[in-house]
Amino acid sequence: MHCPFCAANDTKVIDSRLVAEGDQVRRRRECVACGERFTTFETAELVMPRLIKQDGSRQPFDEEKLRAGMQRALEKRPVSVERLEEAIARIKQQLRATGEREVKSLVLGELVMTELSKLDEVAYIRFASVYRRFQDLNEFREEIERLAREPSKSR
């Protein structure tokens, strides 16, 4: 790393510590040429995978679109912004954990449904009705019955 004081390219690391809940490394460095000390921060560059839509087109992951869709499902439901943000963070982490450059949008949809089922069952049904394109009352009934058979995740 170049010294910000004299532009020499020989520096040594004096101290390294994890910061920001382990997501960042803080390093104290010393320039071998001029002796000045400075601090650097390192973070991993975490790139979200692109989404492959059902029609085969590809688009970048859009966190705001994800948030808006989940907020729409959670509208007028007793779920805090903090819990919503935690769910979004888990979805993003799971997408990154695939290690893939591209994932099918269906994967994202299923992750959203899993998180919504943990947050609020009504929001889950709202989202599922649009996502799975429910056509009639029977499809709603079947999904509600399936949800009722599962152990409660939101209580």
Swiss-Prot record:
InterPro entries per the UniProt record, alphabetical? ATP-cone_dom, NrdR-like_N, RNR_NrdR-like
Q: Where are the zinc fingers (unnamed)?
A: 3-34
Disulfide bond positions: none
Q: Does the keyword Zinc-finger apply?
A: yes
- What are the record keywords, sorted? ATP-binding, DNA-binding, Metal-binding, Nucleotide-binding, Repressor, Transcription, Transcription regulation, Zinc, Zinc-finger
Task: Tell me one GO molecular function of this protein.
Answer: zinc ion binding
Q: How is the cofactor bound?
A: Binds 1 zinc ion.
Cofactors named for this entry = Zn(2+)
Specify the ATP-cone domain's residue ranges.
Answer: 49-139
GO terms under biological process: negative regulation of DNA-templated transcription
Signal sequence residues: none
> What Pfam families does the record tag this protein with?
ATP-cone (PF03477), Zn_ribbon_NrdR (PF22811)
- Family listed: Belongs to the NrdR family.
- Explain the purpose of this protein: Negatively regulates transcription of bacterial ribonucleotide reductase nrd genes and operons by binding to NrdR-boxes.
Spell out the protein name for this chain.
Answer: Transcriptional repressor NrdR
Q: What gene, per UniProt, encodes this protein? A: nrdR
